[in-house]
Amino acid sequence: MKISSDEIKSKLSELAKEISNYYRHRLADELCIVVPMNGGVPFAVDLLRDITNPGADQIFISYVFDEDENWNFSGSNPKNNSSILIIEDIYDTGETLSNLIDYLHQEYSPSDLQIVVMLDKKIKKHKLVDIGWKGFDVEDTWVYGYGMDDENGTLRQLSYISDEERD
């Protein structure tokens, strides 16, 4: 499987239009962006560049998962009762997204919480999560590129996504 950079760009444009349309009349004053994993940063940056007139200031928030399994945000925390958009690279078992959603609801009581994922892995979900928008369905294989690393922690910098063996 290989998803080319052109296919990614086309899908980003499509997702950005759908997300822009969704938020056009729904936001009061703020849209908080949460990017759970490092692998989602290129997707988030490219997607946010294409989102038009979201109706609010955008706040880019990322997190790290510390040793005690607590969510630690870099930058500022979401504000209570704000709209939150989670931008995730891959939805596989649903554990990470489910835990993050629970945490955000408990700590910040968002007025609206939506999720966009680049990849939806065809795998048995341990936790079902309502995904608002998704880019591509992929098989249950290790994928890398476009921010996601391979088994050796490399190849994040590739402009495409693949699961093919590399020499």
Residue ranges and their predicted role:
Residues M1-D167:
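PRPP-associated nucleotide enzymes
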